[in-house]
Amino acid sequence: MVGGELVLAALVILLALLLTLVLSHFLPLLLNPKAPKGSFGWPLLGETLRFLSPHASNTLGSFLEDHCSRYGRVFKSHLFCTPTIVSCDQELNHFILQNEERLFQCSYPRPIHGILGKSSMLVVLGEDHKRLRNLALALVTSTKLKPSYLGDIEKIALHIVGSWHGKSKDKGMVNVIAFCEEARKFAFSVIVKQVLGLSPEEPVTAMILEDFLAFMKGLISFPLYIPGTPYAKAVQARARISSTVKGIIEERRNAGSSNKGDFLDVLLSSNELSDEEKVSFVLDSLLGGYETTSLLISMVVYFLGQSAQDLELVKREHEGIRSKKEKDEFLSSEDYKKMEYTQHVINEALRCGNIVKFVHRKALKDVRYKEYLIPSGWKVLPVFSAVHLNPLLHGNAQQFQPCRWEGASQGTSKKFTPFGGGPRLCPGSELAKVEAAFFLHHLVLNYRWRIDGDDIPMAYPYVEFQRGLPIEIEPLCSES
């Protein structure tokens, strides 16, 4: 009898929990009948798995295509365990980005905070974010066209590109390389030099890179902190990187002025940031400079590898620039300004590749925009890829056509937000473009290439080439 009562009590508790789960999931639908059309999916899971299902990054994916056709370009869903408004509309996206901290606020999932740290520029809010971003902008502005920075980019690009010659010494001999790995080597070497003043061959650089790779894997993993999981390894890797950076900071302080002119020198001269904020700033700089730049370069190589006509136009542009320079003379800021078609290619690769698909925001109050009501506290996802691939805004939207940028604005606009927008526009976006252009200069003047097999950029939603973008490279007979 007692056993039966216990079973009955357990069933009642279980049913109560299930009822609570169902009510908490669907109650926002009942309380907000004027929210945009849409669906919430199953309790607990919502529609997150479908939203995150992998698809080619130059497509919307089945989830967005289905929901946009059924509900329109703005709809409600239940994503990341939260009632959500998804915007695929350029005007609403612009409105959201421009009203940061007034109507909307950055709202990344809590596990991201655990990896990046509470002082990361990606997750801090209000005045703290403004202070960190102003410092980042000042550093980027002073660095962007500095001869020493441009020289460092070129030396590293020459080192990477030159290393391939050793693998295929005979003219005409084809060699296959995993290009994404090479792009990451280049991007990491550049950013670690600019931020910490470290050269690629220093042992501490290799140590930071090893930890950084573990950090990156965990950043995009399931947030389960159990020893051995990618997430746990990422948290541990961040702690090791922080310890290494703190050691470098202490060494600089003890040695006095280093005159290296890197980001760290500027950080150490600032009294506005705590040591923890300085370490987080270094990590943010490494993350942005490494992942964004390497992916951008890989996208450019991928799309040019499929367009012989555009590749030839880029090659001619760089041959013209190189013909006006001495044999071993480095590129200058004036040379960069002449890379006009290269800029068209970079912008088109960003538009088609969609390195940043969407960002996380939260409504701070009930927001009415045109016919839409966005309820207070709901997550808001402005989807940039949906605007980039909208055929009404970009003709033949899924086609790689750099010529569409001729005579057009080269910067961020309502219909082109590859690095976000508003007060949270990525401060290092211009550095990524400079580095991509300089790397491309030496690539097109020294090699011809083609994609080896089928490999496409996939959105998970983070973007990745499944096979690491293997390319067949062949040295050109006339090297520059």
Swiss-Prot record:
Keywords: Brassinosteroid biosynthesis, Heme, Iron, Lipid biosynthesis, Lipid metabolism, Membrane, Metal-binding, Monooxygenase, Oxidoreductase, Steroid biosynthesis, Transmembrane, Transmembrane helix. Induction: Down-regulated by brassinolide in wild-type and the dwarf11 mutant. Ubiquitously expressed at low levels, but preferentially in the internodes and the florets before flowering. It is found in: Membrane. PROSITE patterns: CYTOCHROME_P450. Pathway: Plant hormone biosynthesis; brassinosteroid biosynthesis. It comes from the Eukaryota. Its main location: membrane. Its EC number is 1.14.14.-. GO terms for biological process: brassinosteroid biosynthetic process; brassinosteroid homeostasis; skotomorphogenesis. It catalyses: campesterol + reduced [NADPH--hemoprotein reductase] + O2 = (22S)-22-hydroxycampesterol + oxidized [NADPH--hemoprotein reductase] + H2O + H(+). It is a single-pass membrane protein. Disruption phenotype: The dwarf11 (d11) mutant shows the erection of leaves in mature stages, the shortening of the grain length and of the second internode in culm, and aberrant skotomorphogenesis. Treatment with exogenous brassinolide rescues the abnormal phenotype. One of its GO terms (molecular function) is oxidoreductase activity, acting on paired donors, with incorporation or reduction of molecular oxygen. The chain crosses the membrane at residues 6-26. Heme binds at residue 426. Its cofactor is heme. One of its GO terms (cellular component) is membrane. Signal peptide: none annotated. Belongs to the cytochrome P450 family. Involved in brassinosteroid biosynthesis. May catalyze a C6-oxidation step and may be involved to supply 6-deoxotyphasterol and typhasterol. Involved in internode elongation and seed development. Catalyzes the conversion of campesterol (CR) to (22S)-22-hydroxycampesterol (22-OHCR, 22-hydroxyCR). This is Cytochrome P450 724B1. The lineage of its organism: Eukaryota, Viridiplantae, Streptophyta, Embryophyta, Tracheophyta. The gene is CYP724B1.
